Amino acid sequence: MKVTWTVTPVGYQRIAKRCPSCNIKRDFTPSGAFRINSQKKVLDVWSIYKCTHCDYTWNISLFWRLHVSKIDRQLYHRLMTNDAATVQHFAYDIATLKRNNAELSGRPDFTVQERWPLSITAHQRVRVSVRISRSFQVSLLSILKQQLMLSAGEIKRHVESGKISGITMEMLKSRKLKAEEYEFQLSAETLFARRKIVLTHR
């Protein structure tokens, strides 16, 4: 039996940077707006970030000296209208953040959408597929803690005893997850033990 967890970040990835106004390192988050300069059909585009403690802003470069003919029309429209989904997309775009030497701060919250069969029995072995919708600062361990309602210590004991298999603690702790699918196995009892779901015995 297969259960699918689709994991999606909530909000934005914060960036740590010295704020000249606060005169200390602060967290910055996207303001929700883009800055676009156009000169002779050449575009410069930035995402505007704002200090979480004051109104100081900092621009992260998205496109530099880009000819208008080379940008997708729909993307250009989304940039011009400060589309919220596009702001979030670039907030998690690793290539963009690296190019701007952005220092990541903290780990975003996330939601998990779960899909599983209507029929499930207590002694079944369950294959869990974790789908990361976009790359962000999260570990499989954090996802398991939330979904199984177990502590890190309890999960470690389940891995060591074989109740959770197909994955190691090293893999669970890694925060370098890509937008891909990860799989492991566990018993139906372990999956639903803390969820107040009664499983039938057949």
Locate predicted features.
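N-terminal short leaders/motifs
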Residues: 1-8, 130-138
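N-terminal cysteine/histidine-rich coordination modules
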Residues: 1-86
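A generic structural signal for beta-strand entry/edge sites
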Residues: 44-48, 125-127, 181
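A structural detector for beta-sheet-dominated domains
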Residues: 52, 61, 131-133, 187
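Residue-level signature for short turns and capping positions that connect secondary-structure elements
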Residues: 56, 171, 189-191
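A basic, amphipathic helix-loop patch mediating RNA/tRNA/ribosome contacts
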Residues: 132-186
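Long, intrinsically disordered, low-complexity Ser/Thr/Pro-rich regulatory/activation regions
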Residues: 182-202
